[in-house]
């Protein structure tokens, strides 16, 4: 019985490309409209890029290397932030627990690590979409500001509250319009950390 049900409901596969001659008239018109819209957007972006290149605002030879350097710089900042978070979690666990500190088995599943990874993915999406990555303000204010804001938060939250706390944050990252670093940090600070112990 189970074999018959499996054969009737095969696992979903990736949609294969259907040729134009095999489509109905309605599907053909829909595909033509999609292609026209895509080509129009491409030509518009290309015309804007050529105008900026003529004015000397963009140099294509150095644009990719500049974006790549910015991504590497962000990766270094995220690495420093991860090291700080790991050290901060070890010290706070020793302060909160009366006995010997328990080892954190899955560090990558904690809220702080997911936030740091989300910031890294956000930088990569900025580069992929050819958007302007915001520059770091005067020194290490970006890293230190986020670290100082995170230092006031309780860090011994566990997996049972992780999904509820990160739903809004992950939903914003999956949107078409990428959120700014400030709005993402505001979402983190708006979490009611004091009620985590009552769950």
UniProtKB/Swiss-Prot annotation:
Entry's Gene Ontology molecular function annotations: DNA-binding transcription factor activity
Pfam family, one: bZIP_2
UniProt lineage: Viruses, Duplodnaviria, Heunggongvirae, Peploviricota, Herviviricetes
Protein name per the record: Uncharacterized protein A2
